């Protein structure tokens, strides 16, 4: 298909067309993927004799941009700019047609052999008593939704839509931010979705980043910001309403046409994003009805928030502002005007909120745990024990200790988790308190951390996950006796109670990790901002991204042609291995430094 779009009758033998030669294509690819600024590239080509000796058809960066814009086919939809009016103010939102984005991912030839089109049940034994959960199609959500869809329109193929959003800094100063929204589909296996280089995520939109400082009342400002967020996403996701309920014909990379139903399945974001999306108040759980004062309990019963009650409260908007505010308060949400998920078919936003290993565990509970241990055992003692750790190939050494670290990343917290239990194993606590409960609490939390990240879960490992969390709760009172905590009413601690259910619904946590979103910020927000002149930047960022995607697509086509147009062998998926082995990887040409 792409070859037919890019082909030219006069250049049938030139696989690099619209570029005249291989060297011209390589220079263009370098300039757009690896090169410096457009001004520097123009200065290079303006050197006397450079473009002539290389045989280039373009003389500067502008001519190269025109060649890419007009001659290379559009692989993914172009961005559109539209104004959204909230509280009497107009805001620009840059977005793509979500249906075309889904078709682009669904029809990508690189994913053709990997796509899954129907839910499956996997078992670890012949008696089918121990069920396995890994990719999204092995979860119960796909099964349940497929049954509901078949009851209305039999024979449809579900395309689970995974949306993630996160505001990010694009500069180290001046407080310049971008608000990207990313899209991927659950039909693509998680082993591809977690690789940024696979292109399995699409930048769907840039949302407005305005703080609405012209609104002096803080409560009104927060409400206006929430309404702006939902108004923008409602405009971006609006096509899913009819496409999800009625279905649309979509062609996969192997040429097969199916009636597909793109359905909003899950939302990936940190705690502030989850609250903004669901409309729940700060300190409460965005998924269930547990009160803020009970989030530290492991025994308080809970139920997912009742979507029908929330929708009834939102419908009270037509009854006047006072009735609307009271109805929303009774339903436990903020008064949001028409949230984006209100009319989406088969969508339940409270069920769609997924676990967040990065922010809930590493940057949440583990961060709290390290602070508690530092206060219980003494910062000087913790740092001294860190310095005395022997060198190890698989453990990072913090030679200056860990209590003085600032802006600790999730990766650094993961490294600390590898040895923190070992360095406190014989620690002495104040007031001659026995350290047994402290060690059991730390072990329970660490066990939960590692079990939550299994690439494949079974009914048995999910039971072990619950036991690890129970072990922490049974021994957490040691921190109260030490005077470190008064309570454990932490929303991130309560969120751990939902991991079991969410893994059964949507597969393991590596299906929806916010680490992928954080990594995408580099390629699709920060790098894009650096290519602009920092004035009216989003127009330039979207244009730069479109050109980059065209170059990447043409690169795949050229590589396919050079390989002789060979077809890939059939792909047979299998559950991730449940055994975890340590492997020593040696360099091909070792040096004394590499093996010491």
Spans of features found by a protein language model:
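Surface-exposed beta-strand-to-loop junctions
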Residues: 18-26, 204-219, 395-400, 444-449
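Short coil/turn segments at secondary-structure boundaries
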Residues: 174-178, 194-198, 218-219, 297-301, ...
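N-terminal regions that are enriched for targeting/export leaders
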Residues: 1-79
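Terminal interaction-prone segments of large eukaryotic proteins
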Residues: 63, 69-150, 363-596
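Acidic, metal-ligating active-site segments
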Residues: 164-211
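Short interface patches used for recognition in eukaryotic signaling and trafficking proteins
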Residues: 24-32, 214-224, 400-406, 505-509, ...
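Charged (Asp/Glu and Lys/Arg) segments that form or flank catalytic channels of large polymer-
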Residues: 94, 102, 109-111, 116-163, ...
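Short, glycine/acidic-rich hinge or "gate" loops at secondary-structure transitions
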Residues: 57-62, 245-262, 433-441
């Amino acid at each position: 298909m792409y070859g037919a779009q890019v082909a030219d009758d006069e250049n049938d033998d030139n696989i690099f067309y619209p570029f005249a030669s291989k060297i011209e294509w390589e220079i263009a690819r370098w300039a757009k993927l690896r090169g410096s600024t457009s001004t520097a590239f123009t200065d290079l080509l303006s050197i006397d004799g450079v473009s002539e000796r290389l045989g280039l058809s373009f003389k500067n960066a502008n001519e190269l941009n025109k060649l890419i814009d007009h001659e290379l086919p559009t692989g993914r939809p172009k961005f559109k700019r539209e104004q959204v009016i909230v509280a009497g103010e107009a805001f620009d939102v840059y977005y793509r047609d979500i249906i075309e984005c889904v078709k682009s991912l669904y029809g990508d030839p690189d994913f053709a052999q990997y796509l899954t089109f129907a839910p499956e049940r996997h078992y670890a034994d012949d008696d089918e008593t121990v069920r396995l959960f890994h990719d999204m199609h092995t979860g119960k959500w796909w099964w349940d939704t497929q049954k509901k869809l078949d009851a209305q329109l039999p024979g449809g193929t579900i395309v689970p839509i995974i949306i993630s959003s996160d505001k990010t800094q694009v500069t180290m100063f001046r407080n310049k931010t971008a608000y990207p929204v990313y899209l991927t589909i659950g039909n693509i296996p998680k082993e591809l979705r977690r690789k940024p280089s696979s292109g399995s995520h699409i930048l769907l939109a840039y949302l407005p980043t305005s703080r609405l400082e012209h609104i002096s009342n803080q409560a009104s400002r927060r409400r206006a910001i929430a309404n702006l967020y939902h108004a923008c996403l409602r405009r971006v996701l609006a096509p899913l309403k009819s496409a999800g309920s009625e279905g649309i014909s979509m062609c996969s990379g192997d040429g097969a046409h199916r009636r597909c139903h793109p359905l909003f399945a899950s939302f990936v974001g940190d705690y502030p994003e989850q609250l903004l999306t669901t409309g729940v108040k700060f300190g409460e759980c965005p998924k269930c009805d547990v009160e803020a004062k009970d989030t530290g309990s492991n025994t308080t019963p809970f139920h997912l928030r009742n979507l029908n009650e929330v929708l009834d409260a939102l419908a009270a908007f037509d009854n006047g502002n006072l009735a609307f505010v009271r109805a929303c308060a009774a339903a436990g949400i903020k008064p949001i005007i028409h949230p984006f998920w209100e009319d989406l078919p088969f969508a339940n936003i409270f069920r769609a909120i997924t676990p967040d290993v990065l922010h809930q565990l590493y940057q949440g509970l583990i961060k709290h745990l390290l602070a508690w241990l530092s206060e219980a055992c003494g910062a000087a003692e913790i740092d001294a024990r860190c310095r005395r750790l022997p060198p190890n190939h698989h453990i990072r050494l913090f030679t200056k200790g860990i209590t003085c670290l600032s802006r600790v990343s999730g990766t650094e917290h993961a490294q600390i988790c590898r040895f923190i239990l070992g360095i406190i194993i014989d620690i002495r606590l104040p007031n001659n308190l026995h350290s047994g409960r402290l060690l059991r609490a730390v072990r329970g939390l660490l066990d939960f951390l590692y079990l939550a990240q299994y690439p494949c879960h079974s009914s048995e490992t999910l039971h072990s996950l619950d036991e690890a969390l129970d072990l922490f709760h049974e021994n957490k009172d040691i921190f109260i006796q030490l005077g470190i905590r008064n309570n454990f009413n932490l929303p991130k601690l309560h969120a751990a109670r939902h991991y079991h259910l969410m893994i059964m619904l949507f597969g393991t946590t590596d299906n929806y990790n916010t680490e992928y979103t954080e990594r995408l910020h580099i390629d699709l927000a920060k790098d894009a901002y650096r290519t602009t002149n920092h004035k009216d930047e989003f127009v330039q960022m979207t244009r730069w991204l479109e050109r980059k995607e065209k170059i990447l697509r043409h690169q795949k086509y050229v590589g396919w042609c050079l390989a002789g147009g060979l077809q890939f062998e059939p792909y047979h998926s299998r559950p991730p291995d449940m055994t975890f082995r340590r492997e020593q990887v040696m360099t091909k040409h070792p040096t004394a430094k590499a093996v010491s």
